[in-house]
Amino acid sequence: MRVSRLMLVTLRDVPADAEIPSHQLLVRGGYIRRIGSGIYAYLPMMWKVLRKINAIVRAELNHLGALETLLPQLQPADLWERSGRWQGYTEGEGIMFHLEDRQNRQLGLGPTHEEVITELAGDLLRSYRQLPVTLYQIQTKFRDEIRPRFGLMRGREFIMKDAYSFHANQEDLENTYQAMATAYARIFERCGLEAVAVDADSGAIGGAASQEYMVTAAAGEDLILTSSDGLYAANQEKATSRPPVALPLAAGEERMIETPDQSSIEQLCAANGLDPTQTVKVLVLLARLDDGREQPTLVSLRGDQDLNEVKLANAVSRSLNAAVLEIRPISENQLCQQDLSEFPFGAIGPDLSDTALKGCRSWENHFLRLADATALDLPRFVCGANSKDQHCWGRTWDAMPAQIKADLRTARAGDQCVHDPSQTLSECRGIEVGHIFQLGRKYSEALDARFTNSAGQQEALLMGCYGIGISRLAQAAVEQHHDEAGISWPLGIAPFQVIVVIAKIQDPTQVALAEELYQSFLDAGIDALLDDRDERAGVKFKDADLIGIPWRIVVGRDAGEGKVEVVERSTRCSTSVPHQEAFQQVKDSISTHL
C-alpha cells in the first residue's frame, strides 16, 4: 500500500474531546473518526488492525474446535422476558437500545447474545452425543451508554467476540472454561498485550464463576488488587481481604451520648476520642427490583470501611430473590413523597424500627437489614441512637433485630491478603478486554433448553460464555504501547509491519531503491507501506512515529551507496546499513515474533 493512496489524514493538535492518550493518538493518527456520541468510524488502517486481531482470535478458537456463526443483532423482547433480563436491560441499567416494529412487537439491539444462542441450542442440541459444543461470533454490539467516553473504550457501538459452550456435565464445562482461559492468554500474548486474569463479579450476565482479563494501563477504569506472590488478583468489585484489626471499646455500661453536629464518623470520632473501628455506621438505601418492589434497606458497616456497591447489589438480589435495578440513598424528599416522618440521618442505628415505614405509599413496609462481617464481629460499639444528635455507646448485637450477614466492604490496597496475612494487596488500574463465565443452567432453565442425557432423561444444558472486546482491545494496545511521539503497535496487530519512507521524492535514486525494497517486502509476504508523498522528510518522519508502524526504512541521501536507515519504533534505535541487510533484519524480526 502506498501512503498517497491510503487516505491518511493526521492531526498535529490533540482533539478537544479525547481524554486519554490512546483516544487522542487514534484520532490524530487517522485511525478513527467520531460520527456521534460514542459512535466511531474505523478508517482503513484501523480496520486492518481489527482484522488482524480477528484473525488471531479465530485461529485460537478454531484450534479449540469452536464453530463460527453469526447471530441476529435484532432480538425479540420475548426471549429476554423469558430469561428475566428485559426489564433490567431496558429500565434498570437501561443499556439496551430497544424499539417497536410496525406490528408493535418489541425488539432489542443485542448488547450480548445469551438468549438467542440458548434458544438455538434448545432447538438443535437434543442429545448428550452432540455435546460438548462451542459456538462463537465476531460482530457489532450495541450499548446505550449513559456517558460514552474514551473513544472505543466505552462506546455505544463496538466489535466483540462472544463464544458460548454447551455441556452435559460440570466437569466438561470446567474443562472448556480452562481451555478457553488458556486460549485467551495466547490471544493476548500474540496481540502483544500484558494482560492479567482477575477474579470478577458476574454482573448482569450471571453465573457461578468468572474471570476478567485486564490490560494494565494508567487510564484503566477498573481497579485491580493483587498479591506480590501472584496467587491472587481480583477486580476491586469482587476482591476480598482481611480488614484491619478493630480497637476494643473501653469497658463500661451502655449509655447515650450527645453528639450535636457529629453526623459523620470522622466528626463523631474526633469529638469523642474514638477510633473508627469502634463504630458502626448505618446507610439507609432504597433498592428498586425487577419485580416492581421498592425495598428500604439498612446496611451496617464498621466505621472505617467503605461500601462496595456491587457486593451490596448481589447481597440484596440473593436476599430477595429478585434482580436489582438500582440502589440509591433515601432522601428527605423521598420520605415526603411516601408520607413518612423525617429519619434521624447521621444518627441512625442498625435497630431503626420498621414502624418508621408505617403508612408508606409504595415501599415495602419493613427494612431489609444487611450487615458486613466487620460490623457483626464487634462485641461492643458506638452507633446512632435513632434520635437526632444522639449516639449510643457500648451497644451489642444481642438486642438488635436479626441481620443478614454479607461481605459488603470494599477491599483496599494495603489490606492483608486472605490467603497469606504476611502479604498486603497492591493496586493498579486496568482495562477490561475479556471476560469468561461459567453460566451453569441460568439461561437453559429459563428458556427450556434441554437435552436427553445418557440415562434417557431430560436435563437442562450447562453453559459457559466467553467474550473479548475486539475494538476495545485495539485501543488498549495503544494505551499500553505509546510514547510522546505516537503509537508503537505490537508487531502482531500493526496495520503494516514496515514503512519505507522516501526522504526526497524528487530524487530518482531514492525512489528506485525504495521501490525495490518495497517490492521485496511484498514478495516476501510482509505487510509493507511505502510513503511516496511529495512532503518534507520531517513531516513523513513525524507521521511514521505517530501511526506507529513497528519498522521504518528511510531511503535518503545514502541511497546512491545502497544504504538505508533502519528505525525500530519501540526503541527508537536507528542504524545505517546496506539495503539488503535492512530487508533481512526486518524479515528475521517478523519471522521471530509471529
UniProtKB/Swiss-Prot annotation:
Gene Ontology CC terms: cytosol
UniProt enzyme class: ligase
Gene3D superfamilies hit by this protein: Anticodon-binding domain, Bira Bifunctional Protein, Domain 2
Keywords: Aminoacyl-tRNA synthetase, ATP-binding, Cytoplasm, Ligase, Nucleotide-binding, Protein biosynthesis
Reactions the enzyme catalyzes: tRNA(Pro) + L-proline + ATP = L-prolyl-tRNA(Pro) + AMP + diphosphate
Location within or outside the cell: Cytoplasm
Residue runs in coiled coils: none
GO molecular function: aminoacyl-tRNA deacylase activity; ATP binding; proline-tRNA ligase activity
Top-rank lineage group of the source organism: Bacteria
Ligase listed as a keyword: yes
Gene Ontology BP terms: prolyl-tRNA aminoacylation
Main localization, broad class: cytoplasm
EC number: 6.1.1.15
Family: Belongs to the class-II aminoacyl-tRNA synthetase family. ProS type 1 subfamily.
Quaternary structure note: Homodimer.
The record's note on its domains: Consists of three domains: the N-terminal catalytic domain, the editing domain and the C-terminal anticodon-binding domain.
Primary role: Catalyzes the attachment of proline to tRNA(Pro) in a two-step reaction: proline is first activated by ATP to form Pro-AMP and then transferred to the acceptor end of tRNA(Pro). As ProRS can inadvertently accommodate and process non-cognate amino acids such as alanine and cysteine, to avoid such errors it has two additional distinct editing activities against alanine. One activity is designated as 'pretransfer' editing and involves the tRNA(Pro)-independent hydrolysis of activated Ala-AMP.
Protein name per Swiss-Prot or TrEMBL: Proline--tRNA ligase
UniProt source species: Synechococcus sp. (strain WH7803)
Upper classification of the organism: Bacteria, Bacillati, Cyanobacteriota, Cyanophyceae, Synechococcales
